Regions:
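Anion-binding and metal-coordination hotspots
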Residues: 1-291
Length: 291
């Protein structure tokens, strides 16, 4: 989960068009070889980006929008045996493989979240707070439909159709890795998601209006370094086997005092760090000089 580098783009540029230049720069900067594999979720990808990855000869593992596949592929997916932790492959003519896995844990989570969303919809429907403007594909509003006489209702048919996909997850790859390895590599994206949560949460990173490009670059650099320091502290906590999270360590460290004393006899100075509480003592090893 260590951050290695970053690239800056104009704020008005669509982020879907920033990936290829960023990958090219990253590969060149670190002189990466042919075993370099791009892993990305479906939100960052479009047909143009996938085509550019193929043209550049990159290997990739991408999240698949299995509900948007063609009729024959969707029929194949829904006909698969739903056995926990099983995966199936469908080879495409362009050399890609569509890997579909099933997870009981994911199925239960998706069913639970959908039921909660539908419950909120039904409550809003009964109170008369649903309007035709809410008939869209955002969130659980996708279960709403509007009739010819402009009456909004909840579609039980759409709900039943959505249930069929519970627990199913798709991945697209042009690598030779086996399905289990592909899925494991893709699931590593949770580290990236956690990085964003830490940046916005613990580190409280926020956009700031700057007048010059130099100030923008400095702001991003400071944010990058702050997260890198956070990850290094996390690593040291693990090495020293400290049973505390980074946030709690930081809170405790803020209350530790170091004093500097001048000896009246000879004018020399010595410093001493005061560890006064149990929490202070628990993180004392972090203050020891490196060996």
């Amino acid at each position: 989960g260590y951050p290695l580098s970053y690239s800056l783009f104009n704020g008005s540029q669509y982020e879907g068009f920033t990936m290829i230049p960023m990958i090219d720069d990253f590969k060149q900067r670190f002189t990466l070889g042919a075993d370099f594999v791009v892993v990305a979720d479906s939100g960052l990808m479009n047909k143009n980006n996938v085509a550019l990855l193929q043209e550049a000869g990159y290997k990739y593992i991408l999240g698949a929008r299995i509900k948007n596949e063609g009729a024959s592929v969707k029929q194949w997916i829904l006909s698969l045996e739903k056995k926990d932790k099983t995966s199936y492959e469908h080879k495409r003519q362009n050399g890609e493989r569509l890997i579909v896995s099933y997870s009981e844990k994911r199925a239960k989570k998706e069913a639970y979240n959908r039921n909660r969303g539908i419950a909120r919809l039904r409550k809003a429907y009964k109170s008369g707070h649903i309007t035709k403007q809410q008939v869209n594909k955002r969130g659980y509003n996708k279960f709403l439909e509007i009739s010819k006489d402009i009456e909004v209702s909840i579609s039980e048919e759409k709900i039943a159709e959505d249930c069929k996909w519970d627990g199913l997850k798709g991945y697209i790859t042009n690598t030779d890795l086996d399905a289990e390895r592909v899925i494991a590599q893709y699931h590593g994206l949770w580290v990236v998601e956690r990085a964003f949560r830490i940046s916005k949460g613990t580190l409280e990173m926020r956009p700031i209006f700057h007048f010059t490009e130099r100030r923008i670059e400095a702001h991003i650099c400071i944010c990058f370094i702050a997260y890198k320091v956070y990850k290094e502290l996390e690593r040291l906590i693990g090495i020293n086997k400290i049973d505390m999270g980074v946030d709690h360590v930081l809170d405790a460290a803020k209350t530790i005092t170091t004093i500097r004393i001048k000896m009246p006899e000879n004018g020399t100075y010595f410093t001493k760090t005061l560890f006064l509480t149990e929490k202070h003592l628990a993180i004392k090893s972090l203050f020891d000089p490196p060996k």
